[in-house]
Amino acid sequence: MQPMRRLDLSAVERALREVQGRFAELSQHFTEPRDPFTDEVLLNVVEGYALIDDYVARGIDLFDLQQLNLMLEINATVLCGRDPARRVEFAAHLAATEAHFFNNVEGGIKDLHNWYCAYRSDSIWKRAAGVYVRILSKPQLFIEGNNRTGSLIVSYLLMRAGLPPFVLSLDNAEGYFNPSSVIR
């Protein structure tokens, strides 16, 4: 059996730091303003990549009914990181996000799960694009952090299919941020 390829988190961080270093310049070409790409945001996203890498390595299926809550963990990680003190600080927001995630009848996880199950046998590209659009479309799946969480869930799907993850880079930043604005 071939050993599972793991993410090079240092390479992911390098790519993100390149974007961060030129974010002000890049954002001049975005169709709508974006929040600053701070060190905290960057490090939380890297922790998110470590998390999805672990899920893939352990063979976890995020779209199994028993595992859907792990998408909330990805979202919490991009917002707060893995630090327990930050999780306590944001406990009310995380609880509100969980309620929104499970109880939103117009979008929510039920809609995403049903869509994914209906298209499970389609190409990975169609599934990844459909999942991303459903996460970002109104009503968005999470209260905050939908772009970052969505790109990590897409990366997870790509990695499970043996493909490289999506990583924000200088080459794809404009293409990533502008369609994300239109989807919402």
Positions of the model-derived regions?
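FIC/Doc superfamily catalytic core
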Residues: 1-184
